[in-house]
């Protein structure tokens, strides 16, 4: 990632340092964006917004409080959520009685059945609302309370969306694995 000296150079708005920051961090941040945003062109737009946010708020980054990588990851996730909110795509969240999902297997049991590559492949096909909560919960390890606050939904809706996402994954990956085995 970046050294403390390079971060200090970015704070001074040195063009060479800003360019290096972009070139070294863009692939990592783009991978995060891919988890949230389906459309390629929109991903590129969000990546630009992420760097604008990083560069404009770089002065708030405190080297003594923690590493740079998690800080820029958090900025990226926040920008993705802001983008989705602005696109009104988060209206896909439908409140659901969580009790109706008590028969679903645990997250770990479902996730351990499939490779990471399979998961990433199907993540892009998952409905937006499910995918957002799934990524925040499983990949970014947000609590349901944090997800609810960030997305402005209830904790129950967060749980139900994750349950629906897990069911969706299980259904689609199981079908794919059966086709692969029998095909």
Show where each model-derived region lies:
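N-terminal module of bacterial RNA polymerase sigma factors
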Residues: 1-27, 171, 183
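A short pre-motif secondary-structure segment
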Residues: 133-137
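C-terminal edge and immediately downstream basic/flexible tail or linker adjoining helix-turn-helix-like DNA-binding
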Residues: 6-9, 91, 149-152, 166-183
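Arg/Lys-rich amphipathic alpha helix in sigma70-family domain 2
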Residues: 60, 74-94
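Short, charged helix-capping/linker segments at alpha-helix termini
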Residues: 11-20, 30-49, 155, 178-179
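Amphipathic, Lys/Arg- and hydrophobic-enriched alpha-helical face
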Residues: 22-41, 57, 73, 123, ...
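Sigma70-family region 2
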Residues: 11-12, 51-65, 87
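Internal acidic/polar
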Residues: 82, 90-116
